């Protein structure tokens, strides 16, 4: 009788631990999905920096100052270059 009770309690404990671990893994996978756009944002930032720098260089060659309105979306024209604000 004691062995049966110990076996049942052990199985219940293992089941609870297994369910808890599964829930933690599911929560971690959801966090990872939310975190994915960070790498995409870095690529967008690099592209925007390149585009703004090129447009500022073109204006600079034409003996014009970099126009502040050229840089958009959190970028600002500074020292004839567009920089992230």
From Swiss-Prot:
MF term (GO), any: toxin activity
Signal peptide region: 1-22
Keywords: Disulfide bond, Neurotoxin, Postsynaptic neurotoxin, Secreted, Signal, Toxin
Tissue: Expressed by the venom gland.
GO cellular component: extracellular region; host cell postsynaptic membrane
Prosegment residue ranges: 23-48
InterPro entries in the record: Hwtx-2-like
Cystine crosslinks: 52-66, 56-77, 71-82
Keyword Metal-binding attributed: no
Compartment list: Secreted
Complexes and interactors: Monomer.
Name of the protein this chain belongs to: U4-theraphotoxin-Hhn1a
Source organism of this protein record: Cyriopagopus hainanus
Classification lineage: Eukaryota, Metazoa, Ecdysozoa, Arthropoda, Chelicerata
């Amino acid at each position: 009788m004691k062995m049966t009770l110990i076996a049942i309690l052990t199985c219940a404990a293992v089941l609870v631990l297994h369910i808890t671990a599964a829930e933690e893994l599911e929560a971690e996978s959801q966090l990872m999905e939310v975190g994915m756009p960070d790498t995409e944002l870095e690529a967008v930032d690099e592209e925007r920096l390149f585009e703004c720098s090129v447009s500022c260089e073109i204006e600079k060659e034409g003996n014009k100052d970099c126009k502040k309105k050229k840089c958009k979306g959190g970028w600002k024209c500074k020292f004839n270059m567009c920089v992230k604000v």
